[in-house]
Amino acid sequence: MARKRRAPRGAAQGWLTTYSDMVTLMLCFFVMLFNPTEVDITVLQSIAASIVGDPTGGGVSASSGRLADLGNTVNTLPSLEKGQKLATALKKAVSLFAPEIKSNKIAVTSDERGLVISLTSDSFFYPGSSDLNVEESREALLRVAQFLSDHALAGRRFRIEGHTDSVEVPEDGSTDNWELSTRRAVRVLHYLTDFGAQENRFSLAGYADTRAKFSNESPEGRAYNRRVDIVILDEGHF
């Protein structure tokens, strides 16, 4: 009678090796995740991929339950990092332009487009004109150019948007408020690039009175609507 062959000793413990590898990878991942120093996103993604995958083709798999979403969670970290950079830029802009914000010459906000630096036209331009009041605006525009050139905004693109109110009458030869708003955006661009901002990172738009932020029924609302927005674009609006 033939004797039964005994299974190799190592085969019965194959699941233990797989489980041990998974635990080790998880430990490395969470140590790096909660390390207070800067985290390399690429490394985290590689670790997550190793955890979620099943390198042995058998045994215990981490591809089910909460661990199944681990790779997706890590993939969201670059977006989170970019959001944090934009929040940091917003805080820096508020501090940098504090005097102009206090005097209502500049407003710093954020919306679905990205970070927005709004120049009040009455403080930067002559009434009905695309000519800049250089004496009043030069120092502020220099700081705007320096801010846009900061390494923290590397890779970002900018859009300069001109806006008017519903009653402003062009006095600089512009045929209408569409042309006036566009000319003002162009004029701001020229000053920013003269002060060192990179021209190839900009785009321009003139919206006349079609993008009002406040009601045009009051003088105060119209004054705030007369503006030039410098938008640090979120990636989805490139």
Swiss-Prot record:
Q: Which residues form the OmpA-like domain?
A: 112-236
Q: Give ranges for the Periplasmic compartment.
A: 35-238
Q: Topology with regard to the membrane?
A: Single-pass type II membrane protein
Among the record's GO biological process terms, what is one? archaeal or bacterial-type flagellum-dependent cell motility
Cellular component, GO annotation: plasma membrane
- Predominantly, its location class is membrane
Q: Does the keyword Transit peptide apply?
A: no
Q: Which keywords accompany this UniProt record?
A: Cell inner membrane, Cell membrane, Chemotaxis, Flagellar rotation, Membrane, Transmembrane, Transmembrane helix
Please report the name of this protein according to its UniProt entry.
Motility protein B
Species assigned in the record: Treponema pallidum (strain Nichols)
Gene designation per UniProt: motB
